[in-house]
């Protein structure tokens, strides 16, 4: 019988409820720090406060405090927001911190116990540049063994084995580094054997998602169990999204709440707004792709938590869904994207 593997054990898919499919509650994002503009250097070096928050929102990766999403203040703020998410109807969170991002599995388990929200943890590797020597030298076979162990046996946390419930986020740059090609291949091989869900983080080049899918499918991975993340900053034309969907993967809009058009990690494009995200999802529904759509926030910096003036994990539930209903999206369609699709993606029978 198929089930979903949470950090507290297996559950039936119908218990997930509304699910955020791409979030982080603790990770190290300091690799992506960018030096601040000279005009705002002092403001972005200062502690995040009401007087500096405007600068941090414009240049989120130029505040070292902001990208340290792992200290005690961040963990306390994340827990507060998970409780708010629960209060506003949230059921489950898929935590996408993989090897290289310093995933805090002990904290994830504690959150699941203390908040009542189901957490699904991921295995897999982030980009080569953030790996330590012990992981950077892994072969495809060694990666496959590691992912299998994390899913079937688990990782020991305080004397108990905690199992991962999917492979992700599996990240790559562009052109794809050889290490990252190996991690994609290992992901495809293990997905074919175990039947688990997987989630990919593509680079910001429009060709990246297609190259990832080619490597994954060639390795034996099943397209229907694969999520392509961050499409709201990667593919901007509906035609491109439809073309990607023809490969069979889920299309994930996971930057809801990011409303700053200036995108520090790719200054050649403008980040779309929540309004545009809603519009694009509605167009994709019209294209007959309702059963391939997922929504999330990808919170990975402090300024997006409510304690730091942000929107929190409940933003989609409290702000986005009412806007979608007002524009004609039905409850049945919302349930498909936020309940049914996540459950179908995450459920497997190893």
Curated annotation (Swiss-Prot):
Keywords: Hydrolase, Metal-binding. GO terms for biological process: catabolic process. Binds 2 divalent metal cations per subunit. The keyword Hydrolase applies. This is Phosphotriesterase-related protein. Belongs to the metallo-dependent hydrolases superfamily. Phosphotriesterase family. Its EC number is 3.1.-.-. It comes from Drosophila pseudoobscura pseudoobscura (Fruit fly). Pfam families: PTE. A divalent metal cation 1 binds at residues 22, 24, 169, 298. GO terms for molecular function: hydrolase activity, acting on ester bonds; zinc ion binding. InterPro entries: AryldialkylPase_Zn-BS, Metal_Hydrolase, Phosphotriesterase. Its cofactor is a divalent metal cation. It comes from the Eukaryota. A divalent metal cation 2 binds at residues 169, 201, 230.
């Amino acid at each position: 019988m198929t089930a979903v593997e949470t950090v507290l054990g297996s559950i039936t898919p119908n218990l997930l409820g509304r699910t955020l499919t791409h979030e982080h509650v603790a990770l190290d994002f300091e690799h992506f720090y960018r030096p601040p503009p000279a005009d705002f250097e002092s403001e972005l070096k200062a502690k995040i406060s009401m007087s500096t928050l405007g600068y941090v929102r414009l240049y989120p990766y130029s505040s070292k405090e902001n990208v340290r999403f792992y200290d005690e203040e961040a963990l306390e703020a994340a827990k507060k927001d998970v409780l708010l998410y629960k209060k506003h109807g949230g059921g489950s969170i898929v935590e996408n911190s993989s090897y290289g991002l310093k995933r805090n599995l002990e904290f994830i388990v504690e959150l699941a116990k203390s908040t009542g929200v189901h957490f699904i943890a991921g295995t897999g590797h982030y980009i080569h540049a953030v790996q330590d020597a012990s992981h950077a030298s892994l072969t495809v076979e060694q990666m496959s063994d590691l992912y299998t162990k994390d899913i079937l046996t688990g990782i020991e946390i305080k004397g108990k084995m905690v199992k991962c419930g999917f492979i992700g986020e599996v990240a790559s740059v562009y052109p794809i580094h050889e290490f990252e090609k190996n991690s994609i291949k290992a992901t495809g091989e293990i997905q074919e054997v175990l039947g688990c869900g997987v989630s990919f983080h593509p680079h910001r080049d429009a060709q990246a998602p297609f190259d990832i899918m080619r490597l994954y499918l060639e390795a034996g991975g099943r397209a229907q169990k694969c999520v392509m993340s961050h499409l709201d900053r990667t593919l901007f034309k509906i035609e491109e999204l439809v073309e990607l969907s023809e490969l069979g993967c889920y299309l994930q809009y996971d930057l809801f709440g990011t409303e700053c058009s200036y995108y520090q990690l790719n200054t050649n494009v403008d980040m779309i707004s929540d309004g545009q995200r809603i519009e694009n999802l509605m167009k994709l529904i019209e294209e007959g792709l309702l059963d391939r759509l997922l929504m999330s926030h990808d919170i990975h910096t402090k300024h997006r938590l409510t304690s730091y003036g942000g929107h929190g994990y409940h933003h989609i539930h409290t702000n986005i869904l009412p806007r979608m209903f007002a524009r004609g999206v039905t409850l049945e369609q919302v349930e498909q994207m936020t309940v049914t699709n996540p459950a179908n993606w995450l459920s497997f029978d190893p």
